Amino acid sequence: MVQQNIDKIISNYLTKNIVFSEENLLATKLSLLDTLGCIYNASTYEDPMRFATRGEYGSNTNPFLVINDMQSSKEITRYLSILTRWFDYNDTFLAKEWAHPSDNIGTAFGYFFNHKDKNLSEFLQSIIQMYEIQGCLAL
């Protein structure tokens, strides 16, 4: 498939108004809870926290409070994605593959943290779409 076509297909998919089933939304909520657990557990280790924060935010017993001090979506995305990936990679053999769907949730967090007008339903829908896009590209 030509790169241009992939870009167009993804863009078209992202601009469609799709209503996901309750089953899809429930599965996504569980995935989100898993990711939050990964972030929290990874924050209990010094190495990933030092790397994720570049040593700039000191130690904090709640990894989610660190976000309030961050200046940009990019910084939030990097921080949450590193913690998620670090724990997933060290926790389960399947996450050692080249891409894991929860890798993308940090990006969604970064975006939605700075777009307060968005709601949880839109957040969950974006996660479903990220999973579907990554799954199709992986095939």
What are these regions (language model features)?
Residues M1-L139:
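N-terminal core-entry segment
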